[in-house]
Amino acid sequence: MSPARPRWLSSLLLLPLALALLAPAPADAATRKAQKKPVASQARAKPAAKPAAKPAAKPAARPASKAEQLQRLYADYWEQSLQLNPLQATFQGDPRWNDQLPNYLSAEFRQRNRDFTAQWLAKVEAIGEDGLAGQDLLSYRIFVRNARDALESERYPAWMQPINQFNSPATLVAMLGSGSSAQPFKTVQDYDNWLRRAGQVPALFDQAVANMEQGMAAGVVQPRPLMEKVLPQLDALIRPTAEQTLFWNPITNLPAGFSEAERQRLTADYRRMIEGQLLPAYRRLRQFIAERYLPATRDSAGLGALPDGAHWYAFSARQSTTTDLTPEQIHQIGLDEVARIHAQIRKVMKQVKFRGSMQKFFRFMQEDKRFQFADEQALLAFHRGLEPKVMARAPELFSLLPRAGFEVRAVEPWRAQSAAGGSYMRPSGDGSRPGVFYVNSYDLPTRKTWDAEDLFLHEAIPGHHFQLALQQELEGLPAFRRYGGETAFTEGWGLYAESLGRDLGLYQDPYSYFGYLQNELWRTIRLVVDTGLHHKGWSRQQVIDYMLENSASSRTDAVAEAERYMAIPGQALAYKIGELKMQELRRKAQAALGPRFDPRDFHALVLKDGSVPLDVLEAKIDAWIAAAQAAD
């Protein structure tokens, strides 16, 4: 998993363009030479002096070009989008609205959001793309495409399903208030900001309940297994006293420089806020889900079972993959790729002299204790040890390296049961927070040594950390491109990065290489089961059975992944579709350029413009190949 921002945040905030965030570089100002005033000549005696010449009139200012007009629009759009979505600003390290929590689930906010998107789309389209070229044309087309997709998404009632085990305002608030996420707790002002923001949580939770009630009336409800997972998440956050909650962490870690008076005030204020506002809001939400919503949940698993669900899923698939592939086509691609990867796994079985069926080999890889970590610290230490090893070889494949810092952290216990095995949170825009690779140690025996190298390559280096950190550091791009992104590109790059393991000194034994094949297989299976769920009407159990029969996944992972696909329809398609396109483009470049092909040049070209739709990426690579051939 990854995200250009935390993936759940996009759906929670209903962002205007699914774009993201920081101020764009200002447009290059046209250089103008100042008009020199005439130099007065030395006085000379003359019968009559001529009147002094009038200063030459300044030339009229040059009208702004289309590109300059658009750059200003993007900058204004960005600033106003941060004001509309202060949580986005917080996650990007902009502290100006850290005390605000808009009721982003309300009908009023959704309408404001819709109007905002339509307004800025109209402004951009009024300028048009005629005469634009290069990055200016690319920015225009990405902005317009994403804005239109955002408006089209309003046709579908996602707001009636504000909570599942992946997307939840309850989880968002817990992350912010824990003291270890994007909400800063360094100054007295920071602490007061969270007090004010937390005071707005009850209204948000009550709105979530109201939305779910409307969903119950309309028949738009979550599958039961997803909401059963939400209850233990809430139970982990609800405690008898403030001191027993994770919301007390900022008080436990009060900075030493605070005065005694401030420490006492904040301690008292936080206790009142947690026990008087947060805990009652969490208890009301839990009671509603357990007593009223859970009995109304559905037995079906896929989006196709909901009103207009077939169109909803087709839109989700198109938006996720940035292609026009139909769910049926994607399903068949998945089946074909599963067969191809199975053939590669059989070669590994032969190499290690394993006798038996592929299913027996899968069980061996899951059950043999040699592939287990001793404890959580051993798991974390292994991943931390991969960074220097991979970075030592990275310059052989990459000429662009990010400046942002990076670290490995354990997934917090309260969300570990439903979290993926690994995930990435991008660094803050101001450099105050590094990129973070979260490693999950829940159900530790299922976290395999053969899986670790591949996971690191995908989530960390050279996967999401390289791509997302570099994207933020690109100069001259509008903010919506530096901090936004296409899932097919971002996750496609993560999966493509896994294929570089041997070149980076990893996959040195057949079992680790099997880990790479298994994870490629896992992402390929997603094409089959995601479309199976939402297009073909598969049940949750059918998805779990297919994954267990065709991969080395543990039952824990199979259940978690099946429920993930149920919660986020279409998102899982992006990985393999994006990776297939990147591998196709690399093969095309290698065939065309022969010995002149340099992976550093190819990777720089892929990454230097940030995340783009797959058709745009293909056009860019084709133009590069054509230019190289023309130079011969």
Feature-to-residue mapping (PLM):
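Bacterial N-terminal signal peptides that target proteins for export
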Residues: 1-13
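Bacterial N-terminal signal peptides
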Residues: 11-23
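Sec/Tat signal peptide C-region and signal peptidase I cleavage site
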Residues: 25-29
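N-terminal maturation segment of proteins
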Residues: 30-632
